[in-house]
Amino acid sequence: MSASSSDDFLQLVSGTKIMFGSLPLTHRYGGHQFGSWAGQLGDGRAHLIGIYTNRFGSRWELQLKGSGRTPYSRRGDGRAVLRSSIREFLGSEAMHYLGIPTSRAASLVVSDDNIWRDQFYNGNIKKERGAIVLRVAKSWFRIGSLEILAQSGELDLLRMLLDMVIKEHFPKININDSNKYLAFFSQVVSETAHLIGLWMSVGFAHDYGPFGFMDSYNPDFVPNTSDDEGRYKIGNQANVGMFNLNKLLKALNPLFSPRQKQLAAQILEGYPQQYYKGFVELFKTKLGLLGENEDDDYLIAFLLKLMEDSRADFTMTFRQLSEISEDKLKDLNIPKEFWALQDIAKHKNFSTWIAMYLLRLKGNVGDSDSERRRRMSSVNPRYVLRNWMAESAVQKAEINDFSEVRFLQQVFQHPFLVQTLAERAGYAQHPPTWAEDVKVSCSS
């Protein structure tokens, strides 16, 4: 019997047994919801049960989500439903194998107990199956962990917590440096710009509750039915990042000298440029462009506008550009299996963009068509976790059939490789007609 099927392991990942020497704890954090300060938010249903260091020296914090009430549960029951737990389990793993920094999911345990939820906040309360996810991350601290202390005037605790975070998770920062908090802020700004750029490069709208990968390209894509005004639409993610960093700066300001406050404000002012520069570089890579050209940002914007106008599939447009030869593009000879390119090829300006693109590819010194396609296929996934895939897996899991959950988990371990079974399942084809009806919400 493997360790993962032992009773001790099952009790551990279901939260019914505590590891020897473990002292479970929960984070206290606050935050903003839809732009307004909401006060203390959690952790209302997550327990940190230990820290694990693997054989490579990487340190991981182990956390159970959906494991019951905490001192910060407010009016919640501390539980999580199966549908949202499956989505987080698959979503975080899919992001990891796409090469995007993320928390990971180590296990998913289904409870025998049912819990009450109003999934779409429309008064339709029903029983749903509960679940617990064991998830891991380098750290579970967040901006709200610092905000709550600054908001309540607990500056000594704020300083202590920040020193610990820097010491444990920002080893390049000298803990004795008088500018350590400024260096911390600068690194968080840079990493935030980079992370959101990575999300955009795969068409991902955050977070692991009501998240979504775009089907048709649409900068107004909002996977969350609770977001009536589109605050968190995919095209606004960089702006929300700026908002969050503003709140982090506000939390850190009591620890800064007047000069440090000025420098921190300048660092924040540089965020939009950092983000946009990274965004352009990521999309240049997706298009197989080498070197520098002053018109690259226009070439990218032109393509995205064509995709928006023609409702072209985001993932497969870039993937099929990775697979088609330059000769076929030059002749506008789009085979029927390149269905996403056929959709965008109907646009009256597609031939103009193709001519610009092929001319730009000629500037790839020492490159070849086969090398371009190889390079592009290594960064443009063929499979992403579309909401209809997750919904199909959830519906089967609700009746104790977890085969599709396991299958998707396997598929997303190799998102850039053509997989026979994934092709048969239609994961690289036009989404089914019912996919447009899939809705997700904050309810979990």
Short names for language-model regions:
Residues A46-I49, M200-Y208, D343-H347, N364-S368:
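Short, mixed-charge, low-aromatic patches
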Residues S84-S85, I115-D118, N122-I196, V202-K305:
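ATP-dependent phospho-/nucleotidyl transfer catalytic cores
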Residues M1-G30, F34, D228-S444:
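Regulatory N- and C-terminal appendages and interdomain linkers associated
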Residues G68, G78, M214-F221, G363, ...:
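N-proximal short alpha-helices
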Residues S2-N176, Y232-K233, G241-L245, L252, ...:
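Conserved ATP-binding subdomain of kinase catalytic cores across diverse folds
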Residues D77-G78, D207, D313, D401:
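Acidic side chains
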